[in-house]
Amino acid sequence: MNISVENPVFVHEDSTTQKTGELRLDSDIPMSKISSDDEVFLAPEMNAFGRQFRDYTDTNSERQKSVEHFYATQHTNQTLDFVQKMRSEYGKLDKMVMNIWECCELSKEVVDESDPDLDEPQIQHLLQSAEAIRKDYPNEDWLHLTALIHDLGKVLTLPQFGGLPQWAVVGDTFPVGCAFDESNVHHKYFMENPDFNNPKYNTKAGIYSEGCGLENVLMSWGHDDYMYLVAKENGSTLPSPGLFIIRYHSFYPLHKAGAYTHLMNEEDKENLKWLHVFNKYDLYSKSKVHVNVEKVKPYYMSLIKKYFPENLRW
């Protein structure tokens, strides 16, 4: 199936806040195709805990202390060798056979301990982000489905999938095999990583070449890369931007800080535009207000049928 993805209209925005309450990003981002102000998704200024989104500086918060401990462990253990072993093991896709919606149901059991903005079950985050995008981009059904499934890889924490520790599943992602950019959250903990002082891996390009394309770069192992492998190897017909979003939505050093762009090729640059669109809804739709699962289920089931086989190997 060939999917035609229309490029969004772009405008330049700064880091101030619009009158609509939407947070502006420091880059050119696509605008939605909705004209009515009362229909668009408005990004809140505070998260569910009454703090700024992605605020990692509040050392008095118990949740923040837990998040920092998570990143200390993650940064220490996510080595090139570890990533290669995980990709080899989970790339077999021999853990389970089920459909996409069954995995959505499983995600009810998952809570992301690295997320400073939400402690709700993952199925609510998935539906909140998907429904927010659906309001603003009603004609991009592939984007709605991408939002629904982007975090399904977090089931790696469940016993059925080997019960991986949180540091091997969630959190911001980054390339391994090259220098750890300082834009990574809690960068100081990389000093405990065995790759940090390895001359093969601690240069800007490391084992890669500039412009090689992110497809050829090994990322820290987690739910992004796992769900990307599941979608790709099971023959999903999602367009390239959808697969790009799935694999790199946690790659905040790239799409927020602009790091690692020397590794990108032209296709990556085009797909990054859609990731910038997606990130607003992924980050700012997190809420304590739940989506009625049964009400929206038929719509998403129709998208699953359109873009995926009935049953997938996981």
From Swiss-Prot:
Statement: the UniProt record of this protein carries the keyword Cytoplasm: yes
Cofactor note: Binds 2 iron ions per subunit.
Reactions accelerated catalytically: myo-inositol + O2 = D-glucuronate + H2O + H(+)
GO cellular component: cytoplasm
Cofactor list: Fe cation
Chain positions recorded as substrate binding sites: 54, 112-114, 154, 171-172, 249-250
Family: Belongs to the myo-inositol oxygenase family.
Function in brief: Involved in the biosynthesis of UDP-glucuronic acid (UDP-GlcA), providing nucleotide sugars for cell-wall polymers. May be also involved in plant ascorbate biosynthesis.
Protein name from the UniProt record: Inositol oxygenase 5
Organism: Arabidopsis thaliana
